[in-house]
Structures are given as C-alpha cells and as structure tokens.
Amino acid sequence: MKHELIMSGLLILGNPMMMHAQQTKTTTAESVSTESFSTDSNQAIRENLHQDSIQAIKENLHQDSIQAMKEKLRQDSILWEKQLEAVTIKGTRSQFRQKNGGIVARISGTSLEKEPTATEVLAKLPGMFKDKDGKPQAFIGGAPEIYINDRKVQDYSVVENLPVTQIKEVKVIHHPGAEYGNNVGCVLLITTKKNLQGLAIVENSGVLFDSFVSNNHDLDLTYTHGKMTYYGKLGYANWQGNWKEQDIATNYVSGNQAGDNATNYIASSTLDCKHSYYDRFYWSAGADLALTEKQTIGVKYDGYNIHQPMPFKMTSYAMTNDHVDDNVTGNNKFLYYDWQHHVNAFYQGYYGEKWKLNFFGDFVKLHTEQGQFVDEISEKNLANGVSEEEARNKFTLLPQSDGTIWGAKARANYTINDKQSLMFGGEYNYVKSESRADYTPADKGTSTHSITKEDHAAAFAEYSIDFKPFSLRVGLRYEHVDSRLKYLKDETGRTGIGRIGSSENENSETGTTGTGTIGTGTLQAISANTPIHRKYNNLYPSLLLSHQAGRFSQSLSYRSSETRPSFQELNTGTVYVNRYMRQIGNSKLEPSQRHDFQYQASYGDLFLQASYTYVKDYITSIITPDSDDPQTGYITWTNIDHCWNWGSFLGFRHRWGFYEPQVQTGIQQGFIKAISMGKEKGFHDPYYIFSLYNGFHLPKGWYLNLSFSYRSSGTYDFVTISSVHNFDFQLYKSFLKDKLSLSLNVNDIFNTKRHKTDGIYGNVRFQQQKWEDTRSVQLRLTYRFNQAKKQYRGENSAQEAVGRMGGK
C-alpha cells in the first residue's frame, strides 16, 4: 500500500503560527535592557526611575507586541489556509485490515460499493467465493453465519435485498471463537451506515430474463424520531426456470467389479421440468428505543411464505446386464410449501467504562411440506395383459413437519484494562419438531409420525490479552444436549417404513447387511420404531494467537466443535426421488467431532489462508440397494469413522488508476476411505478454484466488471465432481447523488455451467447429470430516499435450531 502526500505550495512541518508566537513572546520578555541607567551618582533616582520606566516600557511594548502578534497570527493563518487549499492527498490504502482476529473490509467509498448486490460484495471478500447456488461461501469453513448490525440473519433474502450503498464495512471471521455455535465455520459481521432522522425509503426491484421472466420487489421503510426508530419491509419474489436431471444407479451383485462375473442391475431416471416457478412473500416490522445513550432495547417480527410447484416428465428404465426389464413414464410433480414466523427481542447496555451486557430472546414457529404427486405407467405391466388403470402407479406422498423453538442468550463483556478483556455468557434452546409422512391411497406405503424434543444449553467464556506485537485469545464452550425421539402411530395404527408402491411390510429386523443392502421390511438400522433418548455433555476449547508487524498480520488458531445431524437427516419419512430411488433419514446418526487448525496471513492487499481439519464420526450421504429389489436404491446418511482434509486459499485485490483486478485461487483435498467394489478404497483427488474479476472505473461514475470463474474436477466424499467454468458481465451506474442506481448483469454468458457427478459406495455406482438455465440477463433498479440504517441490534439465539429444522 503506497501513500503519497503531494503539495503544490510550501510544505511546513508543524504549525508556523505557534512557532512565530513563541518567538514574539521571547522578544517581548527580553528586549528591555537597563544598562543605560547605570550611573553611580544618581543611584537612588536611577533605581526609582529604573523601576518606573521599566514598568512603563514593558506595558507599552507589551501592548504593541500583542497587537503585532495578533496581526502576524492573522496573516500567517491566511497564508496557512492558502497553502492547505493547494494540498492534494493521494492514497491507495488497502480495503482490508486485520482487527481482533478478523478481517475488516471497507465497503463505503470503495469499488466494492459499486457491486450490484450485497451477495456480490460478500463473495469478493478475502477467503470467500460463490457456491453452486450463487450464495457466498467460505472456501475454508463452508456457509457463513451472517449478522447485520449485531442481528443474526435468519432469512438470506435480507442480505440479497440489502442495498450495497447502505453497507459501511464487513468483518470476516474465519476462526470463530467460543461464543459461536459448533455448526459455525465462518462469520460475516455487516455494519451499515449511520442513521438519519426522519423517514427513509428504499425501493429495490429486479427483473431477470432467461427462458422466462422473473422479478423481485421490496419496499423498506424506516422512521427515526429522537430516541425511537420504527421500520418495516414488505417484499415479493418470483423466479421461473427449467431444469433437467438424469440419475443412473448401477448395482454390481455377485462380483467385485464390472466384468468379473458380476450381475449389473442398472436403473436410470430422467426428470425433465419445462417450467418451474417459485413465489416468495417476506415481511418484517420492528422498533428500537434508546433508553439512554448507553442502553437500548428492541423487538422485531419477521416471516416468509414460499410456494414452489415443479411439474416434470419422468422417463425411467431398468436393465439387468444388457437386457431391458422395464420402461416407465410418468407425469409427476414436486410441491414445496414453507412458512415461518419469528419474534426477536434484545437489550444492550453499557455500564461504566468496563461492562457491556447483551440479552436476546426468540420465538420461532415454522412449517415445511415436500409434497410429491406421482402418476406413472409401466410397459412391463401393460405387456402382461393388465389394463392401463391397473398398470398405473398413482399416489400422493406428503412429508411435512411443524417446529417450535424457544431461545435465549446472554453475553457480558468486561474490560480488565487496556490490554486484557473477558467475555462470557450462556444460551438455551428448546426445540419441538413433529414430522409425518402420509400416503394417499394408504396402501401405497407406510405412513410415519414422530416427535423430536431437544433441550440445548451452552455456556462460553473467552479471555483476550494484548502483548504487542502479539495477542492471544483463549476460549472454552460447554454444551449440554438432551434429545428425545418418539414414534407415534398413524390413523391406521401402523408404525414403520414401507416401500413405495408395495403392500405393507412386516417389522423385520434384518437391518443393514454387510454388503450394504437394505433388508426386507423396515430399515431397522435406519429407522427403528423404539424411542431414542440421547444426552451429550462436551467441552470445546478454542485458541487464537495473532501477530502484527506494520502491514503484515498473521494468526494461528485451533478450534474444537461438533456438527449435529439436521432434522432432515434424522427424519425417517420416505421421500420419493424417482421410480428407482428413495430418500430416507437415519435416526441413529451421531454428531461429528471436528478439530480445526488454521493459519491466516495478510500483507496489504494480499491474503493467504491454510487449514487442516480432522473429523470423527463424519456424517455423509450414501446410496444402498434394497435386498429384495436390487434395482431400487435408498439415499440415506451414515457416520464414517473418520476423515480429514486440508485446504489453502490465496487472494489479491488492488487498484491501479481505473483498473482494479481481484484474483482468487485455492485448493481443497479430502481424505476418506470406504469399501468399494469389495475393496477398501481411498477418495482423495483434490479440486482447485480460480476466479478473476476485472473491474474498470470508467468516466462519469460508470463501473464495468468482466469476470471468469473456474472449478476443477475432484472428489467430494465418495463422489467425483466435474469441472465447471463461467464468464459474467456487469455494468453499474448511480444517479442523483447515489439515490438511484442501475445495474445490468449478464450471468454465464456462454451457458457453460453443467454439473456432473460420479461416485461409488459399496457395490453401487451413482452417476448424475444436471442442467438448468443459468444464462440470464438481470436488470436491477434501486431508489433510496433519506437513506438510513436500521438500528435493530438483536441477535437470533435460535438460528442453529431453525437451520437444522429446514428453516430459511
């Protein structure tokens, strides 16, 4: 980072006015001499005259010198102001700086403020990139936990619709401390700009053109009067598109590999959706009150409603070696429906110069549905002489869940002295989730009904000390989890899981066999009907050692954490994927224990990150065949004894005149083993990422960006992912002193995004190809009147539980 101070006038070190004033005072005090009055004969008179004359002279000179000094000061002041007018300060200081174990990125007044959306801003921060869904993700650490003005973001659309010009700065924490939950690998703290009095309005609208036309609109109102701030938001988003997916599962039986006396059972399904759409309504309202200059309270309510039907045509076939056993066609539909209501309240107060207290409370009510409407017909059945109606497999499956969450959190910060501080607190969540899966007609499968209740309590503490150039942060987190799962009988009195399209099966206990197949009847190892009660009491230490020398900063951290299975992974309801594939949860999953080591360094605009992670009881998805029907497979989850991975990331961003490039590159390599085709096999092919953003600051405030992103092929768990790349174009312009902004984005210009996977677990090989319409043109218009910041500083204490229950 280079600093330049260029002055066309005289460069003066110090204040010349004060220098001259000091000289004037010295002259005034020492300019009167008494040597002319030193005659001996008139000593007494001289002494009297001497005293009087000195006093008079001093007074006269003092008055004159003061006037002269004032005039001189005035002239010097004028000269100094003229010199300052000629001063030009130029600098290209870095947009990023290390602070308290995190990286603070300036957004306001930088080129990042030109980005069209907050998502684009977050994806360009050190150590961040876009995932396959277009959301920001930490290359090391995964999906981030995001806060806006200390309030945890529960619905990502809040980030998507946050105007970039409202963002002041973002702090990136790649090694979260003891305060953050075990499921958090990265934290983004967004701080918005200072609040303005009066009414503030932000209207944000976007239109996206691909095979269809999609749009989104939201209106954000904030009113501040004195110590009170009221705000509300109302938004609607509609997305339309199409997609196509092909799934092929090959089950090798009676042999260790293809061609080695193995019988190959192949099942393939192609899902072709010509028109899928997504309607989302979202809203929020709240207020905060500054009780005093140091104490604030607030309350906020927010919610959403999502409706997403996806009709598709399905064509499937089943083969044994080279013989086609059956062809199945169908007109099916997925129907997703979700809603959520969330209330949050908070208190924040400062006490003296040393104490800061925060209290948060939450109540969440949410509902999710994943309806499936199946209407298929089998050529094999028709060939056997049955009627078309009898050959038709038609049913409805409705998995749904209702969740209730109560949460509370308290945190205290105490400043011991200017070098030491202490943070401690606790949190508690009560979770109740009721899940069921119902079939219509009832003889098409076995309905399930279960209730899960959890009590989750945690206490945490961190001690920080600064001994320049080093600083140390030591943390400890304690967690107690009491989880209870109970299966209920449905209306017919049945419990357990049956196969879709089959008659009800008895409750056998054959379980998962040594070959990885699912036994007849219920999946005992996956979904036993007996109640499950689990308790966990664990300690999780963390440590961060930082060092800073000028522009060079580095840190080394360690963190122990736990990843608990989501409610979807635990849910024993069966989800219909396609004619030959089902999905079912595993209620016996155990939490994964993680140990993360990370090194981080930055120098000016250069950022480096490296990590090593060891995971015990790693949770991963697998495919296992049905022993009665080797062409039918089940996607489920299981615990792997252990795995580990390492990764490294390098980023650089700098501006030279009108050109501002950003380069990001990284590598990830995982090491995991499994029995594959009868032999133990390691999966450890690395994959790389590379992205280049070319920003051009054009005349009259125009900003243009041409970008390229690439991800190589490599292994992720047991699956090999294909390489993918894309080119994007962006043009941005603001008007009316940034009150109005217009952005044009062309995504995936050459339509090159294609996703392919190929994986083997046990004796099953699974291949998938997925295509969706990713080439699009997006136009976004944002208008801001009296732009203001929401003062709400609440923090969602129930976010982890909401995420595990499938909430947004």
Name each region found by the language model.
Residues 448-454, 531-536, 562-616, 635-647, ...:
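Outer-membrane beta-barrel signature, preferentially recognizing the C-terminal barrel domain
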Residues 23-45, 50-57, 62-111, 131-133, ...:
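Short, acidic, small-residue-rich periplasmic hinge/interaction motif at the N-terminus
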Residues 284-306, 332-492, 548-553, 606-610, ...:
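Face-selective signature of the C-terminal outer-membrane beta-barrel domain
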Residues 212-240, 261-312, 339-343, 350, ...:
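Transmembrane beta-barrel wall of Gram-negative outer-membrane proteins
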Residues 124, 149-176:
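Short acidic/polar hinge/loop motifs at secondary-structure boundaries
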Residues 405-409, 458, 584-586, 590, ...:
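Outer membrane beta-barrel strand-and-loop segments of large Gram-negative receptors
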Residues 86, 118-121, 137, 156-157, ...:
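N-terminal periplasmic accessory domains that precede
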Residues 108-111, 197-221:
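Short strand-turn segments of transmembrane beta-barrel domains in outer membranes
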